């Protein structure tokens, strides 16, 4: 994927860049694989904000993605590569030989007409899914299950991949994009290859309005607020103390920099060999 830079004909277009949609082969999605997507505006069922800076944005349909890849032993043909407004990766429309259609995350290099398959012992090639006990060490993988049969939960965004580093007993060791090294059960499935659209991280929105199209609202700095609104509010000029308080804090008074928030008694803690922030 390439990126198109706009000419500076307006202030908004001066820094703006767009992806070149040359890999997209179909503009209209498969109707049978769409669901309504209701916006919450960052509010919960009580109507209170639980996620700030959310709201508005263009209307979308949700594309039903097959994260489980559990249709074993049936070959599918890639019918189209499509845009999905709900994620950074592209999606591929599969036509199975029994007539069923499904969407999957489109890995880098997957083209229309390619054949993909899932199962216990399928060919090691891009787009195929199998348990990690059958994947060779050193392979790049994505859409990885944390619990067998639950469907892929990690390594699903554009350009992401994990490396299958080791296999010992009932567990495989993965090196994740964050730098974390983690153990997962060997029965868990993963898909071969790197997720496509890797240039997504280099896109410059260019103007505030484009953030609003995505449903992202403006953020106000805590230091620019009054003391009643934020622990770091108030003070004369650029008061770094933040209303007499020493350290940067969240709007709810929690230390904002360096405070560890993960529960060390969590059952999965023993599966993390090396944390993502370990030096």
UniProtKB/Swiss-Prot annotation:
A single GO cellular-component term from the record reads: large ribosomal subunit
Q: Which UniProt keywords apply?
A: Ribonucleoprotein, Ribosomal protein, RNA-binding, rRNA-binding
Query: Compositional bias (Basic residues) spans?
Result: 49-61, 259-268
Kindly give the Pfam families that the UniProt entry links to this protein. Answer: Ribosomal_L2, Ribosomal_L2_C
Q: Where is this region: Disordered?
A: 31-61, 222-279
Q: What residue spans carry the Gly residues bias annotation?
A: 232-242
One of the GO biological process terms:
cytoplasmic translation
**Domain of life the protein comes from:** Bacteria
Annotated GO molecular function terms are: rRNA binding; structural constituent of ribosome; transferase activity
- Kindly give the Gene3D superfamilies that the UniProt entry links to this protein: 2.30.30.30, Nucleic acid-binding proteins, Ribosomal protein L2, domain 3
Identify the InterPro entries for this entry.
NA-bd_OB-fold, Rib_uL2_dom2, Ribosomal_uL2, Ribosomal_uL2_bac/org-type, Ribosomal_uL2_C, Ribosomal_uL2_dom3, Ribosomal_uL2_RNA-bd_dom, Translation_prot_SH3-like_sf
Keyword Zinc-finger tagged: no
Q: Which family does it belong to?
A: Belongs to the universal ribosomal protein uL2 family.
- Give a short account of what the protein does: One of the primary rRNA binding proteins. Required for association of the 30S and 50S subunits to form the 70S ribosome, for tRNA binding and peptide bond formation. It has been suggested to have peptidyltransferase activity; this is somewhat controversial. Makes several contacts with the 16S rRNA in the 70S ribosome.
Per UniProt, subunit arrangement is:
Part of the 50S ribosomal subunit. Forms a bridge to the 30S subunit in the 70S ribosome.
What this protein is called in its record is Large ribosomal subunit protein uL2
Query: Which species is listed as the source?
Result: Chlorobium chlorochromatii (strain CaD3)
Question: Lineage from the top down?
Answer: Bacteria, Pseudomonadati, Chlorobiota, Chlorobiia, Chlorobiales
């Amino acid at each position: 994927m390439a990126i198109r830079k706009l000419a500076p004909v307006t202030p908004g277009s001066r820094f703006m860049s767009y992806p070149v949609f040359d890999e997209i082969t179909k503009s209209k999605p498969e109707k049978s694989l769409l669901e309504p997507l209701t916006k919450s505006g960052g509010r919960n069922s009580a109507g209170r904000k639980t996620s700030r800076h959310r709201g508005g944005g263009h209307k979308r349909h949700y594309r039903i993605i097959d994260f489980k890849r559990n249709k074993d032993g049936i070959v599918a043909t890639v019918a189209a590569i499509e845009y999905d407004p709900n994620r950074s990766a592209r999606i591929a429309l599969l036509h199975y030989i029994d007539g069923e259609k499904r969407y999957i995350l489109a890995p880098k290099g997957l083209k229309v007409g390619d054949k993909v398959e899932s199962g216990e012992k399928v060919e090691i090639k891009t787009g195929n899914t199998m348990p990690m006990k059958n994947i060779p060490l050193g392979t790049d993988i994505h859409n990885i299950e944390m619990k067998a049969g639950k469907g892929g939960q990690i390594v699903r965004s554009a350009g992401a991949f994990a490396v299958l580093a080791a296999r010992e007993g009932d567990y495989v060791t993965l090196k994740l994009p964050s730098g974390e090294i983690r153990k997962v059960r060997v029965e868990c499935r993963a898909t071969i290859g790197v997720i496509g659209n890797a240039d997504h991280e280099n896109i410059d929105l260019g103007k505030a309005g484009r953030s609003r199209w995505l449903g992202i609202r403006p953020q106000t700095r805590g230091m620019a607020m009054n003391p009643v609104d934020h622990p770091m509010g108030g003070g004369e000029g650029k008061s770094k103390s933040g209303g007499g308080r020493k350290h940067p804090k969240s709007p709810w008074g929690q230390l904002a920099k360096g405070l560890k928030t993960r529960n060390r008694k969590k059952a999965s803690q023993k599966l993390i060999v090396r944390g993502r922030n370990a030096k």
